[in-house]
Each structure stands twice: as C-alpha cells, then as structure tokens.
C-alpha cells in the first residue's frame, strides 16, 4: 500500500509498532517513545514530518510523484534541472531552519543518499544486475512509505593500522558469515549510527579502502531497525531528558543519539543486498553513484544555517552586554559574517556550475561543495571560539529558570543579571544559555566534533581535493608566465 508523505503521528506510530534492541546506560530500552532521552528528539522529527502537510510549506518541500501519483518528499526527487535542485534545496533549508542546522541526520539526508543510489544503480549492473534492481526496489519502498533511515558505514576504532581481514577477530568489523537460501548471515559491528533508536531502517554502504582479502566485508544492504540480532549500543547521553527547556533550550531539544550497531548473525534477505563479496564494486560505489556529491548539497545547506545561527547568537550576545562597540569584537563578528557569506556564495555557485550525467541527472558542482566540506570544519569551530570569547565568564554564571521563578530572588535576578539598558535579566540569561548550549555544554562539543568529522577526516579530504584538482586542471598561467621572457627576447631581437 502506497502512502506518500507521513505525518508526525504516523512516524511515532511506526516507532511504537517496533521493538528494536536498544541499550542505553547499561539497560535495555523497552519503549523508545517513553524514554526521556528520546522523547524530545522524537517530537522534533515528528514536527518535520508535519511540516510536509502544512500549507505554508507543502508545495515548497514536497511534489507529486510521476510514478505513483502520490505526494512525496523532495528528497526523493531525481534532479533533471536547476529548478529540481532548487526544489530539493528548499526542503533542506526549511528543515534545517526548523532545527537551526543542529540536527545533521534528519530524514532528508539519507533519503537523498538513497535517491542517488537509485538514479545511478546501473553502475552495479555489470557486477550483478540483481543488486541494481534491489536498490531500485528499496528506493521505491522508502519513498512510498516516507521512511526515516540511519546509516553505519565506519568500522569500530580497533586497530586502524590493519585492514578488516587482519583484525584479531574475523568479525570485529561487519562481514558475511555465510550464505543461506534466504539471504546473507552477517556478523560484526559498524558505527556511527546517528539517531538509530528513533529510525525505521538502517542502510549499510561502502566507502573506498577495501583491500584484497576484504571480500567478506565488502557488503552493502538495508534492513529494518528491529531486525532480530541487531543490537543498538547507545553512547552516553549528553542530556537525560529531564532538564528544563529554559536551562538547556538546544541540548534538551536537538540531541542526536549516536550508536554502535552490533550484528549478531543477522539475516539480510537477498532482495535487500546491494553489494556482496566484491571489493572493486565496494570501492567504486561512493565515487560512481553520486552519494559523494548530492548529499553534500544537503549538508552544505544545513552547515550554512548552523553557522549562521551561531553567528546570530554571537551578535546578540555581544549586543546584550554592550561589548560590540569594541573594535576587536567587531572584527570577530565581521569575520563570522564573512564566513557565512562565503558558504552562501559557494552554495549558489554549486547550484549554477552544474554537471549533467549521461542519465540526464543534474549534479551540483563538486568543486564548490567540496570547498564547503573543507571550510566548515574550520569555520564552525571558529564561531564557537568567538562565542566563548564574547561570553567569557558570563557563560559560567547563569542561574536557572527556578531562580527566576522564586519571588524572593526576583529583585536580585533582574538587577545583577540584566544586560545593557533595555536588556532585562531573564532575557540576557536566556541568551547566554543559548550560547552555552552551543559552545560549552557536552551537546555543543558534540556538535563541534560532528562538524569536524561528519564527512571524514578533513585533512584526508583536502588532500583528495588537491589531487583531483591537479588531475583535472593544468597550470596554464604558470606556463604562460614561464614563456614570457622568451617572447620578450624575440621582440627585442627583432
């Protein structure tokens, strides 16, 4: 049965219908929807689904699927023109603004990944036509049911000096144990499955780096998050779900739980297998299917909004205590504003320097998108640093909402926590709490680490970028400069 876009209530109903094996702080979570740590993030994701039905947003972020006649998310749109890319960007922007860019793995991210796999599935036909057909069928299933995916594509950090097949245990890293008539039996672990406890399915896909001997680990597939044998081991929560929204306005709303996925002889049906036992296909999946490029459009838009939000908080923080009159503060804030505009310009360039694939699919320009990926790991930490510098000791001295609610403390709260003229005590404290969640809380430090590494090691990414540019572009101006003396000499001699 085709459904098309879901509501928030339907998303929550889906969560309630499943019983995945989730472990949190040494205990098993029985009801994910009632677990305090997950309650608010579930509400935030549900709110995004509801926006698809809101007349203010529906035509901006969804479209009528030509294949089914149902309304579906723009994340499932295979772009054939700049207008299609901008339609997808509208979705990225609306959802990112709803979360201030602080939730990096909202449903649109992996749905775009899956759409790229679908539109370029022909790449797999030379290896196994059934793999390509499986991806196409899975895309339609996720699209028509508006599912929320997580992914786990990184091996656990064990001995990184050795490939998967040389680890102490054969199945430390996720690999295939055996084949059965029903499908593959897989065992081992993958990380870093963001929001896994509150998603519908998990997709495993491959990155370059597989070596001969890694065949059993060269596997890509998707399964429901409650598949028997799949264990979700959550990291320590950054918040316990009980702290007041006044005191932690961002951390209490937008924390994305990360998890290690342990596969204990899990059955992957044959129709859910996308790659198996093929190192070459596993190494080429990332560069050949657009999953390096199309999702970078989503992460670029989200990163822009996150950087813009941090910049706006810094500006308001400086204004609230009157320090924006000082040249050094103006310099720092001007730097952040220029960073925002640089990322905005790069996104605009990516949406206009298009690449058209033989299939007719339009790709945003990879050079500006990779430039964003290289810059954000530097620019966002700098924004956090500026917040820390401007807020200084004030970030460490915020009272709680309970203090403001106590009549006996009201006069002190207003007198000693007020900002410049016109900024009351509660307003200033709420602003400082917003800043603290971004730059001081464990939640904020996780955001910082995420921005540094969500796309991989930034040093390695910049090295790859350099090598790609070196292969594609000749140093024409240097050659022209080196020829100039000879040309001048000929003119003089003549």
Swiss-Prot record:
Optimum temperature is 60 degrees Celsius. Active from 25 to 70 degrees Celsius. Disulfide bonds: none annotated. Belongs to the FADH(2)-utilizing monooxygenase family. One of its GO terms (biological process) is catabolic process. It catalyses: anthranilate + FADH2 + O2 = 3-hydroxyanthranilate + FAD + H2O + H(+); 4-hydroxyphenylacetate + FADH2 + O2 = 3,4-dihydroxyphenylacetate + FAD + H2O + H(+). Coiled coil: none annotated. It comes from Geobacillus thermodenitrificans (strain NG80-2). The lineage of its organism: Bacteria, Bacillati, Bacillota, Bacilli, Bacillales. PANTHER family: 4-HYDROXYPHENYLACETATE 3-MONOOXYGENASE-RELATED (PTHR36117:SF3). FAD binds at residues 151-153, 157-160, 194, 457-460. The keyword Oxidoreductase applies. Its EC number is 1.14.14.8, 1.14.14.9. This is Anthranilate 3-monooxygenase oxygenase component. SUPFAM superfamilies: Acyl-CoA dehydrogenase C-terminal domain-like (SSF47203), Acyl-CoA dehydrogenase NM domain-like (SSF56645). Keywords: Aromatic hydrocarbons catabolism, FAD, Flavoprotein, Monooxygenase, Oxidoreductase. Optimum pH is 9.0. Active from pH 5 to 11.
